[in-house]
């Protein structure tokens, strides 16, 4: 008999506390302005809050259906048709999840088998690779290069093999703030049309797109959407990240497999929040239609305030993130620079290398501009002093 605790063998031994948690803790410790984690410092729509309170008061406090509240799924179907010219079946094609990250995990788990290869574009959101690993998959990474982070389709085609099972893309792209165009989806289809390859399109920033052509969705591509999962987030759209409500749209056979995983992860999602979101989609569709201008103004406030700094600003076509090059300021690597920036100058940012598996030689950091104007101007004032 031993008193030593039984320690499990880690399935993810290379992972620890995320950089986002680390930088937010460091920001709090040094009372820094937090432009690191991607959440607003302002509240969401008053109408949405009122509808949540209404449904709580009306007793909608028990489990929702596993697939999501019917009214919300129907509202999502109508919105999808309005935006992308395709109406998914509310009963068989749409699943409401506990945030977009759960949708991503459930979709990856449903589609990836042991030994399957999954192509990801680096820099990439940090939840993809662990989910792939837990399903026994192998991540094949394609590095996108600054400042434009475009896909080289010849290089992509060379990555394909008989074991390629899935491609994960993200548009608008976190952290690079670039967007896919319809030509990119056409090129993707040309590359995978002859293969049994699925697609997950992470479109959580679909309504924060500043490009002239607007958001290009996999759901607007007739061939790709037959083998694709589109993932979206109400938290990003309505400035309510703490509600953790997202959804995915996929053809019925794929959705059926996703739901098998979803029912044993969370089973169902916050009932009054779903009902409130259904009300919001029906009553105020102009909210998400106004988001590009809303966040473009915030982007421009930060960009204009940084014009006289020594930071080089990279193009920002979407999301609420901005990349800046600090080569003229410091020779530190990006992790050390972010620590120094937080401790010595009171601004927290995210190093871009944490989004990449391979060594990242560029001196780039990510700033979040989903903040009040006063927050952005105060941060810019400190950054101009570098």
Swiss-Prot record:
CDD domains: AAT_like
Entry protein name: Methionine aminotransferase
Enzyme class: transferase
Source organism, top-level taxon: Bacteria
Keywords in alphabetical order: Aminotransferase, Cytoplasm, Pyridoxal phosphate, Transferase
PANTHER family xref list: FI04487P
Catalytic activity: a 2-oxocarboxylate + L-methionine = 4-methylsulfanyl-2-oxobutanoate + an L-alpha-amino acid
Source organism of this protein record: Escherichia coli (strain K12)
